[in-house]
């Protein structure tokens, strides 16, 4: 709502004043990055996260949030390019190098906090975007090993298996995702069980 946006902008102003007083305080920079993110000022959010990391290189959630925001920026850019180029008969795509910064941040999160499930899950999603399905499967496996109730990991791993032609494994994962509450998995199962494997 407009009231929430106004509150976040006021918070940005307050946090900016606090940062002027303590420019090397990682927590203050991180806090402001969250406000920038919530008002969708992604460039300033990324800049504050970078400054947070420069102040404290072990601030794992700053690496994670920066990866999440950069991924959102790429997805937004990709959707915009697809829309703009759809009328021209051309299709532009993002390069693997566009995803490298994201993957490096997630690698750092995993280095700092090896059991942070969402780092593996998000890195798997980035690997899928880069058409590196084997790496994606390994990261989905690790995410599920850490949290066996992560329905989205089963769902995405199932889709990846199906894409690679492993329908039986894919359907097993989709079924598990459905059991865990991701009910749209059942629609996907129905589509693929109507086909021959």
What are these regions (language model features)?
Residues 1-197:
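Alpha-helical tetratricopeptide repeat
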């Amino acid at each position: 709502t407009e009231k929430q946006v106004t509150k976040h902008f006021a918070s940005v102003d307050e946090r900016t004043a606090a940062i002027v007083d303590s420019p090397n305080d990682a927590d203050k920079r991180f806090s402001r990055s969250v406000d920038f993110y919530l008002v969708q000022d992604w460039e300033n959010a990324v800049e504050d996260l970078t400054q947070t990391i420069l102040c404290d290189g072990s601030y794992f959630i700053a690496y994670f949030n920066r990866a999440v925001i950069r991924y959102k920026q790429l997805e937004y850019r990709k959707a915009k390019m697809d829309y703009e180029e759809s009328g021209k008969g051309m299709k532009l795509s993002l390069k693997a190098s566009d995803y490298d910064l994201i993957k490096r941040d997630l690698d750092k999160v995993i280095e700092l906090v090896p059991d942070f499930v969402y780092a593996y899950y998000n890195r798997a999603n980035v690997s899928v975007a880069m058409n590196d399905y084997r790496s994606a499967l390994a990261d989905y496996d690790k995410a599920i090993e850490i949290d066996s109730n992560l329905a989205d990991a089963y769902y995405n791993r199932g889709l990846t298996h199906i894409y690679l032609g492993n329908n039986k494994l894919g359907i097993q994962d989709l079924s598990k995702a459905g059991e865990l509450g991701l009910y749209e998995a059942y629609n996907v199962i129905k589509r693929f069980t109507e086909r021959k494997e």
